[in-house]
Amino acid sequence: MGMPQISIRFSELAKSVTDRAGSKTVGLILAATYKEKILKLAPGDKVPTGVDKNAVEMSLIGGEQKPKRTVIVFAGEGFTEIDAALETLESEQIDYLALSGTAEGVPQKVVDWVKEQRDQGKNVKAIMNYAADHEAIINYATEKTTVDSTEYTADQFCPRIAGLLAGTPITMLQLTLFFRKFKIAQE
């Protein structure tokens, strides 16, 4: 009599793993204003005029797969409205969060927000050019990254790393994909 119950339990666990194995959602905080507080774009969607096209497109490139979507919130020029942007993100299901740029005090606010979300059971992680002091903070510390002769600072490249991780299935080692996608130059 116990076997059907075990079989059902295995099916439930397998479905849970399958659900988690697919592509993920990127959260992107931009230092800009826009007519809407939040914008959701899937791979292939047109980036509206007035939105940082480069950051959004980099977040949607993905890895082995493309991310499910990118949820963009606007934090005002110079991140003056970062608190409101983070509050807007609270109701969204995001897996990897990135800033495009930074301002004084903003990285710590994002780190604190991510920790709060984790305490509430959400599985969000942040990719930042900021010292990682928590398992949910991924420190992208490469000062400059060059892609197709375009040079990016670490802050500018964090959306790309978020998209890469969001598009990497759990069956694949993320570091392996990273080295396949990028050439790392050391001085």
Question: Positions of the model-derived regions?
Answer:
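Short, intrinsically disordered N-terminal pre-domain segments
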Residues: M1-V26
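A short linear-motif detector with a strong N-terminal bias
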Residues: M3-F10, V47-D52, A75-G78, A103-P107
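Intrinsic disorder/low-complexity signature
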Residues: S16, T49-V51, A136, T145
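Generic cytosolic/nucleocytoplasmic N-terminal low-complexity/intrinsically disordered segments
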Residues: S23, D45, D52, P67, ...
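A glycine- and small-residue-enriched flexible loop/hinge signal that marks low-structured segments
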Residues: I29-A32, L39, A84-E187
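An N-terminal, globular interaction/scaffold subdomain
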Residues: I29-A98
